[in-house]
Design a protein with these regions (language model features):
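Pair of pore-lining "gating" transmembrane helices in MFS-fold secondary transporters
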Residues: 12-49
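Residue-level signature of mid-helix packing/kink "hotspots" within the transmembrane helices
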Residues: 69-78
Length: 155
């Protein structure tokens, strides 16, 4: 029996949810977590080597970018949650990945601080959707008895 058969033995799932659904959830989670952290990892290189921003100015710019990113996340997570009840989780999750992909495609075009802010705004909009939809789906799939176990495995 393959991977998906073992998943359903490990977790008690809600009616209509199969091991394939859980496998897809793990697949999405596997890519979501690095996507959310990618910007922070490459930012020092971007500021130093691409934009040539002096080291003494990088701290304030990084702080401003992080605050802006978090404000976008906080303002959009509730909207994504409300929209997911109307439109469904899968279309919004796909749209969020496309928004992040758009931001990453624009990343090589960053030529100054304004472009960097725009890049971060686009990525923040997508990351807000990914994190809120991933959390919602992770809560939708398991039965109550194994909810904590599945959420711990996903995150």
């Amino acid at each position: 029996m393959g991977f998906f058969g073992r998943v359903t033995r490990t977790f008690v799932l809600r009616d209509g949810v199969t091991g394939r659904h859980v496998g897809a959830l793990f697949f999405v989670a596997f890519f979501s977590v690095p996507i959310a952290g990618f910007v922070g990892v490459v930012q020092p290189f971007t500021l130093t080597e691409i934009l040539r921003i002096p080291f003494d100015q990088q701290g304030s710019l990084t702080g401003n970018l992080l605050v802006m990113h978090e404000l976008v996340n906080l303002s959009l997570i509730g909207l994504y949650g409300a929209a997911s009840d109307k439109l469904g989780r899968r279309p919004l999750l796909a749209a969020a990945f496309l928004i992040v992909a758009l931001g990453f495609c624009l990343f090589p075009l960053v030529s100054g601080q304004v472009a960097l802010v725009m890049f971060r705004l686009i990525v923040a909009c997508g990351v807000a959707g990914i994190t809120s939809m991933l959390t919602a789906v992770a809560n939708d799939y398991p039965a109550e008895v194994s909810r904590a176990r599945l959420i711990a495995a996903v995150f």
